[in-house]
């Protein structure tokens, strides 16, 4: 019988080349980096995770993120450990330290997916993240595809960029990203006015669904990450609820099928 996966999203560093306007890491008064664990402690966490997966009778899967995980001094030793124990992993990072040689190294160590962010069209994205970030991200999609790592594009939806995302998904498809998905922005205390209203968000889902239908045969998988997709599709008659009063349709999977570790 095939086991289900238990996933860990592992923040191994705060170090980053960007200062995204919606980033929670630098949202407070303290702009310094949090201390990083050394390789010995990272190994301890890794083996504890493997033991947990064994207890739960599930297969381990890890998404390594930050900051930019490629900036951690021990990242390559950590990824080599994943390979030694045959644990598949994804990188959630930036384009700036990614090149053909790095991509090949990641592939050899077992990297399945490399996720980068696009938070609007060029002007908006570079305003949110960093000048030059938009072009750098698009250019690295090809680098990943060439070595056989799935290129994933993720978007954070806010009032700043919501009108551009239906166009942005077309850009991601044109550049042959292997997947595209988005999440709602969770504002910090100083940025509540950037939160999208429920009616705006429902209209946005409608526009995105129309785009997904038009582009469904272009080779990009559209990840319906937001829990509200099920309600949206149910209202359109495209999602059926089983007749079972004990069935839980959706909700937070934390501790059930995934955990997040800040280290």
Task: Identify the role of each PLM range.
Residues 6-8, 60-64, 89-91, 114-116, ...:
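Hydrophobic faces of well-ordered beta-strands that scaffold small-molecule active sites
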Residues 18, 123, 151:
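Glycine-centered loop/turn positions within well-structured domains
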Residues 30, 69-71, 95-100, 114-131, ...:
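Conserved radical SAM core fold
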Residues 32, 128-263:
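Radical SAM enzyme [4Fe-4S]-AdoMet core and its adjacent flexible, acidic
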Residues 55-59, 80-84, 118-121, 146-150, ...:
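A short alpha-helix capping/helix-coil boundary motif
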